[in-house]
């Protein structure tokens, strides 16, 4: 059985880790980096770039460079959060036929899981290059506050990338696993504050250690799936745009190229202000008008950035209060605070968290790598390589059905340990009702319409009876991935209907299979392209080497051989520009055969050179005079 790898599929950056013996190891990608930007670009010549190469070309290709796709995964186009992104993203977000938020790139419609799969493929390849064997299984992390549709969409992305997703685990829980891996932690309560690129989570976790066995029990979780570093960047971008408009009278929001340059500069300035008190945003030739080119040069202080994002940091603290309350704990009950996610490097975030908990957060957990390492630990647990670890996670939101009067009746309340199963008996609202619609909801509001609809199904064939008489047993079953299975059974007739909740949104099986096939086809075409490039390089080297040998052979090469070689070289150069690998290989062979005489001459010259060298060496030896000598020691 191969390794089960751990993947942190992040909004801004992604990371992959494996278990190496008893330690989790983060792997470097092909660029030599331990994290990979979650950026995907589709170039004009049909190439798909992922990570740093995609980020590098974003300025010149903003409409076809996709980032922060995790914010759209499992979302409806009309969701308030999706609409916020529609307004600010340089790429095109559209409504799919089923109402989901999809993307349009070069007139092609794409689902967010399909795009995220490109990042997962890069993670998979990174692990395969390190291990030297195929990788087919993974544990993928998601924000703790992801709903059912978002979790399902993440699993779909894994399948499209050619991975069997053995488990979906919550990011803060993964960070806790990484924290406890090499430590004698004893019994502790920890708070994991996870502020990433696009999402925020807080989890209160109890670690119990008995006879070396560690149990990680999530007591409560809360969060905001649309709050993260991207929002901090947006505040900085808006400030810079407004300042430039005040100064130059030009609104850069209408210029996608300028906005992409500005996005990079804003992110860089934000990072610099974590260690410096002031930075310059200097962008020459940012735009131009009738009077000529315009340059941006704006000083930004740390205090200014803090004033721009103060409300975002405060917004993150409300879920922290709720999580503590749900766990039935006070601030003094928390032993350790762990910060996860790149945005927690901001001093203001660290200070607000430290002030709230009354203690400094731990500095020995890498905020960028802890989640992937924890996912690798869970992979090790599932593979049987890691013993003595038990993980008890929770469902982040209440689950229930719509009942009479448009009310949500919860069957499983939030922060229930998973996996779990719960049944409740309901009845009909009308006399002689022959069918009921089970409308499944997720959320904390009493009014059904204010919660997230996960889907609905009908149970028909109910025997005619006065209202309130039939007994319909509804069962909710949440698996270890946090994904819901629902069944409804009429106790009288025995008729049963069951579904795995795949929201009215989401990809159907046919779409997933098509995307899997597309991904496989792309992998095949990528492999063929790589082989073609290798053969072209081989042809190029052969042409260069042959020309050099012809020159060195001079008059020793018969004229007819020289003509044949030059003709074969010209033929090879011509086909090397084409796409036919077999044709290039055939012309390489033709040149090798035509160069037989040339090879013979080259070998003769090499032998002659070797003989001459040997003669010179012997002559030098003859000139050597043997001398006797004795060692004279210095007098001390």
UniProtKB/Swiss-Prot annotation:
Keywords: ATP-binding, Chaperone, Nucleotide-binding, Phosphoprotein, Stress response. The keyword Protein transport does not apply. Pfam families: HSP70 (PF00012). Belongs to the heat shock protein 70 family. One of its GO terms (molecular function) is ATP-dependent protein folding chaperone. Induction: By stress conditions e.g. heat shock. Residues 604-636 are annotated as: Disordered. Acts as a chaperone. The modification Phosphothreonine is found at residue 199. PANTHER family: HEAT SHOCK PROTEIN 70KDA. It comes from Photorhabdus laumondii subsp. laumondii (strain DSM 15139 / CIP 105565 / TT01). This is Chaperone protein DnaK. The gene is dnaK. Residues 604-615 have a biased composition (Low complexity). The keyword Chaperone applies.
